[in-house]
Structures are given as C-alpha cells and as structure tokens.
A protein has these predicted regions:
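Helix-loop element at the rim of GNAT/NAT acetyltransferase active sites that forms part
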Residues: 24-40
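Conserved acetyl-CoA-binding loop-helix of GNAT-fold acetyltransferases
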Residues: 107-114, 118-131, 151-155
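Conserved acyl-donor/pantetheine-binding loop and adjacent beta-alpha core of acyl/acetyltransferases
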Residues: 74-111, 168-170
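Conserved active-site alpha-helix within GNAT-family acetyltransferase domains
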Residues: 123-124, 137, 144-172
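Conserved GNAT acetyl-CoA-binding A-motif
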Residues: 105, 131-145
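Active-site rim helix/loop that mediates acceptor-substrate recognition in acyltransferases
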Residues: 37-60, 64-66, 70, 74-80, ...
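Short hydrophobic/aromatic beta-strand element in the GNAT-like acyltransferase core
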Residues: 57-62, 72, 104, 109, ...
Length: 187
C-alpha cells in the first residue's frame, strides 16, 4: 500500500474547533522546545485559540500526513481596536500602527513538527493561509533566537518593523514582521 501523501486544507473557526486538542498538543510540542522554551503555554494556547477562532475572518491552514497533523498556521484580520501594536519596545508612527477594516491580517501561529521541517511544509502553510487574502498586508511575531524561522520569513518577503514585549510570563520578546499581500504588492 502506498504511503499517505501530505494534504493541506483551510478551515474556518467552527471547523477548527473540532481540532483544538490536536492543535494544542502540537503547539505544546513545538513551543516547549528550544529556542522558545515556553513550558506550560498549552493552557494559555487553549484560551487564545477559543478567542481567535471566533474572530471574523479567522482561518486555519493545516498539513496532514494521512490523518496525522504535522503542521498548521492560523490567523485573523486585525480589528481597529487591536492591541497588536501596544507593547512595542519603541513606538512606531501612527501610519504603521493604525488599523482599519481590511488593512492587516495577523498570522498568530505557524509551526511544523520537528521531523517534518525543511520539507517545504511551513512555506506551503504560509502560502495557503495568505492566499487570496483581501487585506493590504500581513503581520506576525517571531522570537529573535528562532534563526531558522527568521531566515525563512525574510526569504518569503517579510521585514522587521519593531520588537514587542511579550505579556506571557516567561516568554521572550518577539520581532514584529510585516509584508505586503499579493493583491497590493506593487500598487
């Protein structure tokens, strides 16, 4: 029998809710390891996920090998009253941080199980979650010590605009990255 192939799919918040335990387990597996070392973050993830999946425009991109979850990305559009830009170590101009409907899509998580990395799965999830987005730009945060992720994001067109203090206890500061989305690139 042939080995199962990788499959990718997009889920809305309602469909994603049925995968909450799997997502939480994978989140814990990835973020408890270096360079993140965010032990105990699983409970915080569960609370954040409940909030995120209910946001208008929420989307989850998942990668599976057979039925086995090997990676996912999730995000949602930022609202005008977002706190995304609130904890920057250096303030940015209002023209960067002011949000309006349709301006910014936030990639809240993008992760792949360690044995499945360096196979293009992260890039495929990245491209899937951002494909056909109507927003002008996207943003995400990444820990400076996550050098492989930093290099990947740079090669995918992201640029650092700031650093943010993480409000989660024991979590390191993160770089805030931004990139134009394809519909607006070059306009």
């Amino acid at each position: 029998m042939p080995a199962p192939e990788l499959t990718f799919q997009l889920l809305d918040g309602t469909a994603a809710a049925g995968h909450a335990e799997e997502l939480q387990a994978l989140h814990a597996e990835v973020y408890e390891a270096p360079p993140y070392r965010r032990a105990g973050d699983a409970a915080q993830f569960a609370g954040r996920f409940r909030v995120h999946r209910r946001q208008p425009g929420f989307v989850l991109a998942e990668a599976r090998h057979g039925g086995y979850l090997v990676g996912y990305a999730l995000g949602m559009p930022l609202r005008p009253a977002t706190s995304w830009w609130a904890d920057l170590t250096t303030p940015l101009p209002d023209d960067v941080t002011a949000e309006r409907p349709g301006r910014t899509f936030a990639v809240a998580d993008l992760l792949v199980r360690a044995p499945w990395r360096r196979q293009g799965i992260g890039r495929a999830l990245h491209d899937l979650i951002l494909s056909d987005r109507p927003e002008e730009r996207a943003t995400l945060t990444v820990v400076p010590a996550a050098t492989a992720a930093q290099a990947a994001f740079r090669s995918w067109g992201w640029r650092k605009v700031a650093r943010t203090r993480n409000q989660d206890p024991g979590s390191p500061a993160s770089d805030v990255l931004v990139r134009a989305l394809p519909a607006t690139r070059g306009s």
